[in-house]
Amino acid sequence: MSESLARTERLGLVEVFRSLGPSAPTLCEGWRTADLLAHLVLRERKPVAALGILVPSLSARTEQLTLELASDFEANIRLFESGPPSWNPMRYLDALVNGSEMLIHHEDVLRAQPEWKPRVLSAQAQQEARRILRGAAQLMTRGAKVKVRPDPAGALTPANGEVVIRGDEV
C-alpha cells in the first residue's frame, strides 16, 4: 500500500522547509516557516500545551511555547519529519486525521512564495483530499449564505443550485 496523504504531505513540507529556511513567508498571518513548523511540532509533541489553539484562555501559553520552539528550526524539522512520538495516539491515527492539516499547511507555505504554481496531486492524493473535503464540507461552510454539499464528483455545490464551486481541491 502506498503512503497516506498525511505522510506524503508531511515529507513534502519537510522538503520545502529545508529548501526555504526559517524566514520564508507563509499564508498563516504573521508566521514565517519557523513559526508554522513550531506550531506543527507543538501539536504533536506537546498536545496539552497546544490546547491554546482551541481554547482561547490558554492561547497566550501556546503562543509563548510556539515562539520558544521556533528558535531551533533544524531540530524541529527532524522532529516533524519523524511524525508524532510513540506515546501520542496521533502516531497511529496520522493517516486518518492529519491529511488535511498537512495538505493545508503545505499549501500555506507553497502559495506564499512568489514563484508558486499550482501542483498536480496524484490520483490517490486527490481521492483522499476529496474524502476529507466531503467529511468537512458542512463544518467548513456552516456560516455560508448558501447551503453547500459535496456533489458525487467531490466538488462543492449548493443544495439550492444557485452557486457552484468546482475545481481541484488544491
Protein language model regions, located:
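Structured surface interface patches that mediate subunit assembly and partner/cofactor docking
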Residues: M1-E3, S19-S23, K46-A60, A75-V170
